Amino acid sequence: MSYKLVIAEKPSVAQSIAKVIGADKREDGYLEGNGYIVSWCVGHLVELASPEFYDEKYEKWRYEDLPILPSEWNYQIAEATRKQFGILKKLMEREDVTGLVEATDAGREGELIFRLVYDQAKCKKPFERLWISSMEDQAISDGFFHLKNGREYDDLYRAALCRERADWIVGMNATRLFLTDTNRRRTAVKPMTVFLFRQVFKKSLSCEYNRSGRKVISYIGCNFFMNSIDKKTW
């Protein structure tokens, strides 16, 4: 009997999918049944290597070593989720698994999570894409009836890679630059203070500017009136 390996983004989603497609036999790290094996990632199982992976000199944060710009990108298995990656890799290598279903979240990050696992495991088996925005039973059933060719989302994967690598370049360099330059200039900031720059930081700063800064800049003064009642007239 041949199987399709379905990979979801998190265990709760995998369980919802397994219930609909009839994979009801629970194993260590996956569910199996009715011609399907359903397993899951736990967030990002594969992540970009840290700077010291490229060169040991980056273990020490030095202003003179910046910027850090890898000529090629390397990835590593996240230590906290290494076991689950191993389970997925073994499932991909099973001879009775003839294809995969990418069931991670329908979006850029979901695409990245699956593809990095797929590539890191050196899997060459064909895969289809489950693209749904609801976890209702009917939506899951309809989604499996209309599975897409996984390669139709190659551009989305490339966009996710660009976002991830840009985030790494900005985050790693800006964090080290701010800390080393601050300490180098002997400002009042404590030596062990660490400022982490990431996309979330930039997005938050942008939101605050849009909410507060632009309102101040575009503010136009105007007259206003207040009503009052003289109690003596009653």
Roles of regions detected by a PLM:
Residues 1-181, 195-196, 222-228:
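Intrinsically disordered, low-complexity regulatory segments
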Residues 164-167, 186-190:
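Amphipathic alpha-helical surface "interface" segments used
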Residues 178-189, 209, 213:
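Short, solvent-exposed helix-loop connector elements
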Residues 190-191, 201:
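Conserved catalytic-core segments of large NTP-driven translation/proteostasis enzymes
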